[in-house]
Structures are given as C-alpha cells and as structure tokens.
A protein has these predicted regions:
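12-transmembrane solute porter fold
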Residues: 4-20, 25-27, 40, 196, ...
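MFS-fold secondary transporters
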Residues: 34, 84-89, 104, 178, ...
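Helix-breaking motifs and short loop linkers at transmembrane-helix boundaries and internal kinks
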Residues: 37, 69, 90-96, 158-159, ...
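Helix-loop-helix hairpins in multi-pass membrane proteins, especially solute transporters
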Residues: 63-196
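Hydrophobic transmembrane-helix bundles of small-molecule transporters
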Residues: 134, 156-268, 274, 281, ...
C-alpha cells in the first residue's frame, strides 16, 4: 500500500470517533437521565453542548492549523479528545459531564479541519483527492448514522460511561499511527487567529439557547432571562459587525446576501435540526414508553440511519436529472409527510409503518442536505468557495445543536403541560415528575408499587401525546419551509437532461 493511502487510513481512523460522538448519546439519554439524576434541561445541555461549541470553534481551529501546521493540530486535537473522553466517562454529575462534552467539542473542532487539510495536502491529483474526500464524507455520515446503534450495543453490556471510555484506546492508537504516518505540513505563522471572536460567537449562541430554554421552562425571573438574551444578541451583533469590517473575516457574512446561498444554509440547518432532533426524541420514546433496551432502540431506528447514510449517490443523480429546486423542495415535502405520518403511528402495534416512514425520512432529509450543499457551492464565487464551505460546516453543527434544543424544549413543555399526576404526591415530587419523563422514572423507585405504576402510566401517556405534537409541528414547519425554498430557488437553472 502506498504512503498516500496509509495516510488516508490514519486520518479516517481518527475521524471515526468524532463522527460517532455526535450522535452516540441519543440512545444513552434515558440511561444518563436516571444514572446521573439529571433534569430534562441538563440532559439537553449534555447532548447539544457538543455541536454548539463545535460550531463556533471549527473555523478558528482551521486558522490555528495554518499557524502551527495541521499535523500538530491533529495530534493536539486527538490528545484533547482522549482526555475529555476519559473525563466524561468518569463524570459524577451532569454539570461535569456537560463540561467534558464541551472539551470534547474543542478536540473535535481541531480534528475536523486537520483531517481535511491532510487529505488536500496528501492527494495532489484531483481524481484521487475527490475519492479520498468521498471516503471522508462516508465515514462522517456513516459514523453519525450508526452512533446510536454503537451506543446501544455498549449500554447493553456496560455502564453509561463506556460510550466515552471506548474512545480512549482508539485515540492512543491513532496518535501513535498519525505521529508516524501523517507527513508534517508547513506552518504559516502570519495566519491570523480569531480565537476571541470564536469565543464571543460561542458565548452568544449559548446565551441565546439558554435564555430560550429558561423562558420555556420558567426557571429564571423574566428580567434575568431577558438580560441573558439581550447579552447574547448584543454579542452576536458585535460578531457580525466585526466580520463585515474585517479584511480577512472568520465568516464571510456577505455571502448571506445571496438568496440561493441563504436558502442552502437554511436547508442544511433544517435537515440537521429534524434528523438529530428526531433521533433524540425516538430514543426516549422507545426506551421510556415502549420499554426497549438501548440496543433494541438503536436497532429500531436503523432504517432512518441507513437511509440517511447511504442515499447520497441517489440524491446526487436526482439533482442531475430533475434539478436542484425540485430535489430540495421534494425532500422537504417528503420529510414533512414522514413527520406527519410518524405523529399518527403507534410504534408498538405498527412497527412496519414506522420503519417505512423512517426510511422515507432518512432519504428525504439526506436529499435536502445534498441539495443544500449543491446550492451553496454552485452559487458561491470560485474565490470564496472555502468561505462558503466554512459556512456550510457551521450550519451543520448549529443545526445539530439546535435540533436537540428545539425538539427537547417543545417536548418538555408539552409533557409538563399535559401530564395528569396521580394523587398522593408531595409538591416536590409532583414538580420533579412534571419536569421530564426521565425524572418521573427516577421518582418511581422511591414510591410504593401502586403509586409508582400510576405515575409511570401518566408519564407515558403525557410523553406519547407530547411526541405526537412535536412531530406534527415539525411536519407543518417543513411544509412552510418547502414553499419558501421553492420560491427562493426559482432562478436556479434546470439541468439539460431535465429540459
């Protein structure tokens, strides 16, 4: 085997745990909720902090790679990822796990641009480079798609920390391999590093998400929630103005003035919001309501994972034959139909209907995702292709983080509003049981058998009703977005084969 392909194998090996970690916690959410005694809000932060931090860090880490060399960045990111995985596996509380997941995101944000730079510098020939990038994309989508299944397999036999602990030996091996195999790239010391701007971007996103969660949960005084939201909005405004005035901005905000690029970003974010949010909701529904094990839940969701992970070539062919506008709008419409159908489906008595709709959902979401990438890259000027790609990467990570936050917020709010608690619970117990189904499950362990059974029945009924509302809401919003996408992409020319 040539050194080029050995380098690619080493790069892909370090990328695998990063891709898996984006979704591995989805089936672990119920287990984490019970094991750590985390609230519904804490559980959402445990899962979505990874994508939200990564969204703000991936761009400055690319600049850091230019400054110190991408091999050093790859090794440093791998080391941080390994240490953070160990910290996460040993976390005694929800807050320490949230901090560990944030550190994991920092390591992952170093690894992603380093792997891409390694591929670009290793493969000079365009055909080989495209093949290598295709394999990199397949590892990313496949790892994310099968993350819940991997998590389910580990939780079936080991404690919850195993979903993080498995990264440690992998990281040790890949550090040794990459240190020897990956060639050193020259560093460009003059490359500016906008770390402060990245931190302000992350802070603004986290403050806005936190204020939205607090407003819906009623956890803070209204004035304090408004103050946090105002601070986040002010930081985001400062960041945007800074990017517009910079000669070498971290994010080229002027690209958002192009309607097609803006539509592509909206599609990318929406696709990730719906896919990631749906997987998290399904994992809790299957385990808490239908009493499936983590592995059984992962297997039940396999159709959406397989369809989303392997629909790329078909979607690409459809774009070439039918046109970007048609595939983008069609993907949104089919996704909306899938969500509306799943909202009316009983997963216990109608499994085949659920699997069929999930397969359609996975394919349609992935088609919309490919269409978004095509729209962004086709509309961006050639000299700004890298900047457009960076914006697309941010859209993916923000979509993943916001999907967990939005689906989780609507689910929690609806659950709390609809649960009918059995009599005999104290005020503190009633508040705990109304917070989330995970906390209701934890509470049943301290109750008499009859009361525990009544509470579980009430929690399951409320969660099922909330789950249907969330999916129906997502379906309606996708219908509205499809109409907007159809209008905004009206200027995109059809391919010759479609004329």
């Amino acid at each position: 085997m040539s050194r080029q392909w050995m380098t690619l194998m080493a790069i892909l090996l370090v990328y695998i745990p990063v891709a898996i970690d984006a979704t591995v916690l989805h089936v672990a959410a119920p287990t984490l909720s019970v094991a750590l005694g985390s609230s519904g809000n804490e559980l959402l932060w445990i899962i979505d902090i990874y994508s939200l931090v990564m969204a703000g860090m991936v761009l400055p880490m690319g600049a850091l790679g230019d400054k110190i060399g991408f091999k050093r960045l790859l090794l440093l990111g791998s080391a941080i990822f390994g240490v953070a995985s160990l910290c996460a596996a040993l976390s005694p509380t929800a807050l320490t796990l949230i901090a560990s997941r944030a550190l994991l995101a920092v390591g992952a944000a170093m690894i992603v641009p380093a792997t891409l730079a390694g591929i670009r510098s290793t493969f000079a020939e365009a055909s080989q480079r495209n093949m290598a990038l295709g394999l990199w994309a397949a590892v990313g989508s496949g790892g994310a798609a099968f993350g819940p299944l991997v998590g389910g397999m580990l939780l079936e036999h080991f404690y919850w920390g195993s979903v993080f602990l498995i990264n440690v030996p992998i990281v040790l091996v890949v550090i040794a391999i990459n240190a020897k195999v990956v060639p050193r790239q020259p560093a460009r010391r003059e490359q500016p590093l906008n770390l402060l701007q990245a931190l302000i971007l992350i802070a603004s996103i986290l403050m806005l998400v936190f204020s939205a969660k607090s407003a819906l949960k009623g956890q803070l005084a209204l004035w304090l929630t408004a103050l946090v939201a105002s601070g986040g909005a002010a930081m985001l405004t400062w960041f945007i103005r800074k990017q517009l005035s910079a000669t070498r901005p971290m994010v080229d905000m002027r690209l958002f003035t192009h309607r097609i690029i803006l539509s592509g970003v909206m599609m990318a974010m929406t696709a990730l919001i719906t896919l990631v949010g749906f997987e998290l909701l399904m994992a809790q529904e299957l385990q808490f309501v239908h009493q499936k094990t983590p592995f059984e839940a992962g297997m039940f969701m396999l159709p959406v994972m397989v369809a989303s992970g392997f629909s790329g070539p078909i979607a690409g062919l459809l774009v070439s034959r039918l046109g970007l506008r048609e595939v983008a709008t069609g993907g949104m419409l089919l996704s909306a139909f899938s969500f509306l159908g799943l909202a009316l489906t009983d997963f216990s008595s109608q499994p085949w209907q659920a699997w069929g709709l999930m397969t359609l959902l996975g394919f349609s979401v992935a088609s919309a995702l490919l269409a978004s990438s095509s729209a962004i890259m086709a509309a961006a000027p050639k000299e700004k292709a890298a900047a457009a790609g960076a914006i697309e990467t941010m859209a993916y990570e923000l979509g993943a983080g916001l999907g967990i936050a939005l689906f989780g917020l609507i689910l929690t709010r609806s659950y709390s509003a609809t649960i009918v608690l059995p009599s005999g619970l104290s005020e503190s117990m009633a508040q705990q049981a109304s917070s989330s189904i995970g906390e209701a499950v934890s509470l049943t362990e301290a109750l008499p058998a009859g009361m525990a059974e009544a509470l579980m029945a009430a929690a399951k009924a409320a969660f099922t009703q909330a789950h249907s509302l969330v999916l129906a809401t997502a379906g309606v919003l996708l219908l509205l977005l499809a109409a907007g996408i159809w209008r905004s992409l009206a200027s995109v020319a059809k391919p010759q084969s479609a004329l």
